[in-house]
């Protein structure tokens, strides 16, 4: 399981710890990932995703998983999230017709 958010693509970053004497040692900045269950209102199903805390706040801000995925850019989403987005868009089109 990779250390990457499935919704925003946020991954591990690298940088330096810098001491008072300006000594630099390499370190990793890990994303704050949480295993959460999000419910799709359109598909009426729940999905377990590994998302960052900031992505979880964004999902709630946009009004749920469905509206977040519809507005999200495909290149940021994981393969699983892209599949979920396609299913949601297809189901919404069926309901509108």
Swiss-Prot record:
GO terms for cellular component: cytosolic large ribosomal subunit. The keyword Ribonucleoprotein applies. Signal peptide: none annotated. The keyword Cell membrane does not apply. GO terms for biological process: translation. GO terms for molecular function: structural constituent of ribosome. InterPro entries: Ribosomal_bL28, Ribosomal_bL28/bL31-like_sf, Ribosomal_bL28_bact-type, Ribosomal_bL28_sf. Keywords: Ribonucleoprotein, Ribosomal protein. It holds the Pfam family Ribosomal_L28. Belongs to the bacterial ribosomal protein bL28 family. PANTHER family: 39S RIBOSOMAL PROTEIN L28, MITOCHONDRIAL, LARGE RIBOSOMAL SUBUNIT PROTEIN BL28M. NCBIfam families: L28 (TIGR00009). This is Large ribosomal subunit protein bL28. It comes from Bartonella quintana (strain Toulouse). The lineage of its organism: Bacteria, Pseudomonadati, Pseudomonadota, Alphaproteobacteria, Hyphomicrobiales. The gene is rpmB.
């Amino acid at each position: 399981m990779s250390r990457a958010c499935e919704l925003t693509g946020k991954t591990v970053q690298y940088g330096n710890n810098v001491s008072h004497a300006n000594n630099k040692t390499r370190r990793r900045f890990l994303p704050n990932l949480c295993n959460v269950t999000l419910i799709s209102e359109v598909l009426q199903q729940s999905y377990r995703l590994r998302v960052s805390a900031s992505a979880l706040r964004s999902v709630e801000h946009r009004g749920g998983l469905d509206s977040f995925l519809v507005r999200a850019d495909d290149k940021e989403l994981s393969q699983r999230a892209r599949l979920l987005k396609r299913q949601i868009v297809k189901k919404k089109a069926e309901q509108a017709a």
